[in-house]
C-alpha cells in the first residue's frame, strides 16, 4: 500500500511543479498573431472571355481631323458564371462587380489605352473604353461596382465598348492594335 501511495505522491509533486509556476521562472509573454482571409464564393470568368480579340474595324485616317474625334464603338463582353445567387447564403442581395482595366496609357491622353508601338503602327490616337451606358472608363481605372444581372445558374454578362479616339490633329495611318488586361472584384 505504501508503494502505491508513493507513486501518487510523486505524480502529484510533478503535476504541481508544472501546473503552478515557481516565482523563480521567467515571466516572458509570447504573443502569436494569426492572420488570414475568408473569401466568399466569387464568379468564374468563362474561358472564351479570358483571351478575346476585338475587331475594331478599318477606318480612314482622314476621319480623325480634330482632337477627340472617335470611331464607331465595338462591343465586347466579359462572361462570368457560377456566381452566388440571391438564394445563396453567401450573398443575400445579389452580386456586384467592379472591372479594373489595365494597360499602357497613351502619352498624350492618359485616359486612353496606348496603341502598340511598331514601325507600321498608327499614331495620333488611342483606344477609349466605355461602359454599356457609353460612360468613359480611364485605362488603369475602374468601372465602379455595379449589380450583376444573374440568370438562374448564376451567370452574367458584363458589356463594354471600345473605340479609337484621336489625340492629335494629324493621325497617321497604320496598324492600330493594343493589349488590354482586366481584373474583376466582387462584393
Language-model regions, residue ranges each:
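Bacterial N-terminal signal peptides
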Residues: 10-19
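Mature extracellular/passenger domains of Gram-negative fimbrial/pilin and adhesin proteins
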Residues: 2-8, 23-187
Amino acid at each position: 500500500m505504501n508503494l502505491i501511495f508513493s507513486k501518487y505522491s510523486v505524480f502529484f509533486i510533478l503535476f504541481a511543479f508544472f501546473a503552478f509556476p515557481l516565482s523563480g521562472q521567467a515571466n516572458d509573454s509570447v504573443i502569436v498573431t494569426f492572420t488570414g482571409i475568408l473569401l466568399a464564393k466569387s464568379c468564374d470568368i468563362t474561358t472564351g472571355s479570358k483571351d478575346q480579340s476585338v475587331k475594331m474595324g478599318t477606318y480612314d485616317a482622314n476621319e480623325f481631323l480634330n482632337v477627340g474625334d472617335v470611331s464607331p464603338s465595338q462591343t465586347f463582353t466579359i462572361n462570368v458564371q457560377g456566381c452566388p445567387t440571391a438564394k445563396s447564403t453567401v450573398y443575400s442581395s445579389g452580386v456586384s462587380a467592379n472591372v479594373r482595366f489595365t494597360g499602357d496609357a497613351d502619352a498624350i491622353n492618359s485616359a486612353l489605352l496606348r496603341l502598340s508601338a511598331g514601325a507600321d503602327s498608327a499614331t495620333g490616337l488611342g483606344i477609349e473604353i466605355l461602359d454599356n451606358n457609353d460612360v468613359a472608363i480611364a485605362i488603369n481605372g475602374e468601372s465602379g461596382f455595379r449589380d450583376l444581372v444573374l440568370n438562374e445558374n448564376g451567370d452574367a454578362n458584363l458589356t463594354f465598348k471600345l473605340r479609337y479616339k484621336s489625340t492629335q490633329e494629324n493621325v497617321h495611318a497604320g496598324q492600330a492594335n493594343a493589349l488590354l488586361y482586366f481584373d474583376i472584384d466582387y462584393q
